[in-house]
Each structure stands twice: as C-alpha cells, then as structure tokens.
Amino acid sequence: LPFAASFNDLGISQEANSTAVDFIHQKIKQVVKDQSVAEKLCPKTTMGCKRLCVDSDYYKTFNRDNVSLVDINEQPIKTITEHGLSTANAEYRFDSLILATGFDAMTGALLDIKIQGSKTLTLSEHWAEGPLNYLGLMMNGFPNLFTITGPGSPSVLSNMIVAIEQHVDFISDLLIFMRQNGKRNFEATRQAEIDWVQQVNGIAEQTLYTSGCNSWYLGANIPGKPKIFMPYIGYPSYVEKCDEIAAD
C-alpha cells in the first residue's frame, strides 16, 4: 500500500497507527451506505497486524440489494445444512458455499511433506514448539536442506520476488563454496538456530505486530500451533546480515 509506505512509524507508534486506522475507517464509511454494515467492516486491529482488503470493488459490493453481511461474532455458525448453513439466529440458503477457512502460513506446506532429518527427528518434531532455524534458511539436523522465504526470513513482510531472488543467490553461492572446498554437507548449529529465533522475536516485540493481534504471522489462525512471530522484520538489515556471513 503506498499509503502505508508513506509513513515510517505505523509499525512502532500506536498513536500514528491509530490515526491511520481512523483514516481507513473513514474511507470505508464513505463507500458503504449502511453505516451499521460499514462499522462491522471496519478493522478492529492495528494497521498491519492483518492485511487490509484493498480491492476496488469489495466494499461497494455491500451496497447491492442481493448482498448482506452476517457478523458471526454476533451470530455464530451452528451447522452446515442441506441448503446452506444455520447460525444462532437464522438459516441461510445458498447455491454455493465457499469455505474461506484460512491457511497454515509459512510452515504448513513444509510440515505436510514429513521431512526426516539426520538425527531421527522429523521437521514437525524439530518445530514442535515453533519454527527453529538459522536465517530462515537452514536447520540443525537437516543437512543440505534449504528453505526459501520461510519462517525466520523477511518473506511475507517484504517484496516476495526480491526476497526469493536474494535467498536463491545466497544458497547458490553457498553450494559453489561447498563444491570448491570439497564439502558434502552443510547445516546450522543448534545454538545458531536459538540465537536467530531470539533475534527475530526480539525485533518483533519492538513493534505493534505482537501487541495483542491474533494474526497468521503468529500462527494464531491454526488451533494448537505455537504462537511465535515468524517473519523477520527488516529486509535491508537481513540482507546485510546475510552478506556479512557470506563474506566471513
């Protein structure tokens, strides 16, 4: 969002963030005619904690006669029925029912592969208390396994294409180094993993990302998933760190 990029303190100043949230609420209420509906559509979290819907026609849709908004905080879904679903207050009939239930971000796809490490642990077991790795790239006990834009790297909080390219370049340079020096295996140390995860979370705790908002950045949308802030905040500083390591 160009709007978000125009200010450098939205992620660290609650006052500045609240001003931005008020602006967003105002814009939504200008588009949605029914103010009670508009109020329900206004995000109740800090800006950036969860992604905004910035589609040009999304909010206009709620002005149509054949569209209604049901707040499941007020009317929890009870059951799926033969013709639709029922809430605590009413039954709704549909031609189609789309289940937008979210996704297991950053770790789910990797854990579904059931990767076996060299120390009898699977990746699921290694990450049982949250993703543990070094630079978001490599894990102890999993030699020559590299993750691209995974947890512990800027990934979803940066330009993803640029982040992918930086990771591929880093891994490629490492593989060339290994070949030139006759190395067959490479993995992070356990302590390097611990220190890196502490650094990732230490940076996040200085921002509003961890100020009580239950987002998928924390894995809060998945029941039972450890609540740990997964992305590294700050692409330039991350690249600088990777460059320092490569030059060492």
Locations of regions flagged by a protein language model:
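N-terminal FAD-binding dinucleotide-binding subdomain shared by FAD-dependent oxidases/monooxygenases
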Residues: 1-248
